[in-house]
Amino acid sequence: MSETKCGAKVTFKIVLASDANQPYKVLSVPEQAPFSAVIKFAAEEFRLNPATCAIITNDGVGINPTQTAGGVFLKYGSNLRLIPRDRVGFYY
């Protein structure tokens, strides 16, 4: 976490999990920002519909968007994956 004039910030490295090239974006946001806003911004950066995206950890654990960015950073770390919801689930 880094300290600025407007409060502490957290930095996330968000990888687009659905792309074979694994592109990523690095986002720095205020730690009190709602994580749903982080998901929305990350999806827009990858030109995806935010309403159809989710963020997961590298281990595949889904992250509840009702938390703050700081809470997510403390629980899950800075390396996260953005995945379109049409790719979430299991196929036989």
From Swiss-Prot:
Example of a GO cellular component annotation carried by this entry: nucleus
InterPro entries: Ubiquitin-like_domsf (IPR029071), UFM1 (IPR005375)
Keyword Disulfide bond appears in the UniProt entry: no
Similarity field: Belongs to the UFM1 family.
Any single biological process term in GO: protein K69-linked ufmylation
Organism: Theileria parva
SUPFAM superfamilies per record: Ubiquitin-like
Record cross-link Glycyl lysine isopeptide (Gly-Lys) (interchain with K-? in acceptor proteins), residues: G89
Native organism taxonomy: Eukaryota, Sar, Alveolata, Apicomplexa, Aconoidasida
Record's protein name: Ubiquitin-fold modifier 1
Propeptide: 90-92
